[in-house]
């Protein structure tokens, strides 16, 4: 379990004080993948660097498996950092060392014998899919391969927690998905708790169980990934969800304007099992109404499928529309009126 209680990080400059992290409270379950998303400057990277005390909090407590990180002695902190490891955006590899030697580096520092360090490194090279590249140097690797080395190095000391600070943001979409699949594989095999910092909702949707959304140093929304996708509460969250779902239906409805007085354009939000059910067909027949589908999308999360339909109902009485909405709610479909004539 990771607990953050009223965590604050304030920087002092000669011109002004900067409040980078503002009273953040989080609980992260052991064995889960927890995502923190926000735009640049939201405070998310500062936050994650306080998990292993690369940044000291100005105030508040960060407790990992019962240890208050900012109250450990230097010796205790060094030992704890072996169990709270980190993967960086720009790999941070040692360019004069081979793949094998980059991975053995933290083991050498920890006092492993050369034989033991090599055994562990070769095991990790196999795990991250770099067999045959152990003697290559970083300059000979692709971006995805470099990040695989970074992940293997982070796993060298068998950590309990893996921190990923924008670990895929320097990668192309295909390589990003390959790295995310690798993290899922590692999480299951090593029984890790993973905390991911990102500005990409695609990353959150693909691998995370829960997400916290940050803006201006504060957590503005938090919950299960499926819940946040189904019903985002904050404007920033809605922007992230809209971008990931390619939800840009405004162009699709322009040709329908102006609407007749008894016409509606509605967005139907689906989740879980009802994404595969013939809900629209059922509703159309039950209420004897025409429904035109303007736009649709379904995406998968670790907690189930989420998706939406934007539909045009050319003619429906107001009282009938209320019944229509209630029927959809009974089938766990959220109805949002986009426009009404």
UniProtKB/Swiss-Prot annotation:
Keywords: Amino-acid transport, ATP-binding, Cell membrane, Membrane, Nucleotide-binding, Translocase, Transport
Primary site of residence: membrane
Molecular function as annotated in GO: ABC-type D-methionine transporter activity; ATP binding; ATP hydrolysis activity
EC number: 7.4.2.11
Database matches in InterPro entries: AAA+_ATPase, ABC_transporter-like_ATP-bd, ABC_transporter-like_CS, ACT-like_dom_sf, MetN_ABC, MetN_ABC_transporter-like, NIL_domain, P-loop_NTPase
CDD domains named among the record's database cross-references: ABC_MetN_methionine_transporter (cd03258)
Record's bilayer topology term: Peripheral membrane protein
UniProt cross-references to PROSITE patterns, sorted A to Z: ABC_TRANSPORTER_1 (PS00211), ABC_TRANSPORTER_2 (PS50893), METN (PS51264)
Domain ABC transporter residue range list: 2-241
Entries under Pfam families matching the protein: ABC_tran, NIL
UniProt binding sites for ATP: 38-45
GO cellular component: plasma membrane
Subcellular location: Cell membrane
Reaction catalysis annotation: L-methionine(out) + ATP + H2O = L-methionine(in) + ADP + phosphate + H(+); D-methionine(out) + ATP + H2O = D-methionine(in) + ADP + phosphate + H(+)
Oligomer status and interactors: The complex is composed of two ATP-binding proteins (MetN), two transmembrane proteins (MetI) and a solute-binding protein (MetQ).
Family indicated by similarity: Belongs to the ABC transporter superfamily. Methionine importer (TC 3.A.1.24) family.
Function: Part of the ABC transporter complex MetNIQ involved in methionine import. Responsible for energy coupling to the transport system.
Protein known as: Methionine import ATP-binding protein MetN
Gene (name only): metN
């Amino acid at each position: 379990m990771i607990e953050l209680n009223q965590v604050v990080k304030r920087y002092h400059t000669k011109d002004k004080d900067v409040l980078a992290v503002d009273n953040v409270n989080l609980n992260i379950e052991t064995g889960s993948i927890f995502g923190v998303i926000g735009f640049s400057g939201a405070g998310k990277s500062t936050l994650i660097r306080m998990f292993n005390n690369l940044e000291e909090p100005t105030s508040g407590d960060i407790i990992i498996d019962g240890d208050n990180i900012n109250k450990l002695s230097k010796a205790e902190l060094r030992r704890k950092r072996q169990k709270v490891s980190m993967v960086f955006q720009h790999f941070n590899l040692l360019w004069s060392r081979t793949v094998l030697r980059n991975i053995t580096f933290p083991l050498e520092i920890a006092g492993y014998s050369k034989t033991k360090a090599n055994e562990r490194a070769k095991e990790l090279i196999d795990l991250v899919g770099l067999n045959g590249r152990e003697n290559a140097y970083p300059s000979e690797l692709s971006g995805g391969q470099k990040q695989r080395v970074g992940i293997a190095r982070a796993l060298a000391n068998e950590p309990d927690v893996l921190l990923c600070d924008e670990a895929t943001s320097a990668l192309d979409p295909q390589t990003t998905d390959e790295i995310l699949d690798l993290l899922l594989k590692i999480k299951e095999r090593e029984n890790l708790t993973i905390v991911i910092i990102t500005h990409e909702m695609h990353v959150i949707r693909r691998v995370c169980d829960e997400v916290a959304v940050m803006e201006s140093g504060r957590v503005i929304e938090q919950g299960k990934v499926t819940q946040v996708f189904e019903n985002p509460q904050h404007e920033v969250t809605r922007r992230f969800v809209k971008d990931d779902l390619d939800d840009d239906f405004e162009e699709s409805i322009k040709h329908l304007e102006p609407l007749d007085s008894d016409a509606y354009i509605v967005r139907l939000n689906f989740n879980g099992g009802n994404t595969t059910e013939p809900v629209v067909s059922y509703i159309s027949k039950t209420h004897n109404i025409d429904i035109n589908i303007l736009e649709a999308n379904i995406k998968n999360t670790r907690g189930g499928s989420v998706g939406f339909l934007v539909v045009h109902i050319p003619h429906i009485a107001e009282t009938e529309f209320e019944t229509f909405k209630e029927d959809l709610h009974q089938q766990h479909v959220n109805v949002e009126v986009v426009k009404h004539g």
